[in-house]
Amino acid sequence: MKIFIVIPCYNEEAVLPKTLEVLGNLIKTIKVKTDADTELLLVDDGSRDRTWQMISDAAKEHKYVHGIKLSHNRGHQNALWAGMEAVVDHCDAMVSIDADLQDDENVIIDMVQQVQEGKDIIYGVRKERKTDTFFKRFTAQAFYKLMQSVDKDTVYNHADFRMMTNRTLKALMQYSERNLFLRAIVRQLGFREGFVYYDRKAREAGESKYPLTKMLSFSIDGITSFSVAPLKFITFLGLAMTLVAIIMIIFALVEHVQGKTIQGWTSLLVSMWFIGGIITTGVGITGVYIGKIYTEVKRRPRYFIEERV
């Protein structure tokens, strides 16, 4: 059985030596416990530091290390896709994991064993996030709960740490969309699923590649790529506001018939600003969906590979 571990990398100079050491030892353990041959594919997503040089040096030193360098920073999802596309014809199964190894690499052994037992996709699920800051933990939980509210198939506390067999990889490669949100796409494949649970570790070196701005952008991409719930919400809100307006018109007419004058410039201005805000928000949300359609119809390449080792 041949396995590839695909690792997207972006400015991982500080953590990469430790990552390569840990995964090198893991490869030996996997061989002993499962008799599977394992290799690494590191995808440099246009790093500005010495990440690619370190990958190249590791590939020269170890036969099990391979690397591809993207010509430009294309984002985590595209880098991961590039790695999967590169190994799909050369492996029986593939596991994706981030370079910081905050996800427990040791459960990959359990993933391999589940694949050998007949499972096709094994999801890595975080049990605890004690090493995260309160803000990171709170925002992550809010994101997963929001995703589950718009897509019931979302795996709670699962990121992109998963193992997929060759046939599921080939099925995934048939998806042609450019707005990638892999954790939702993979769930749509079906097949026989398994789960492994682990505690998230602290990052040993370097900085998180997902600051607040990127987290928000990723959340919006995830929701709008796989749900029209925001558009439905706007429609519902518009109908609700129309109903309120009708009630207010009836109330005003009744007051007028009774000879009463309705005062309230303040309430009128507040109502106008409120309605204006709702309309602007609705136009913005609609614009996000139109922008995604615009991106899809252009059919531009996801990435270009500058170099391989």
Describe the predicted segments one by one.
Residues 8, 26, 58, 70, ...:
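Amphipathic alpha-helical segments that mediate coupling or scaffolding at interfaces
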Residues 1-132:
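Structured catalytic core of nucleotide-sugar glycosyltransferases
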Residues 183-309:
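Hydrophobic helical membrane-anchoring modules
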Residues 25, 29, 57, 61, ...:
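Conserved amphipathic alpha-helical interaction elements at protein-protein interfaces in regulatory
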Residues 8, 30, 43, 114, ...:
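Histidine kinase transmitter module recognition
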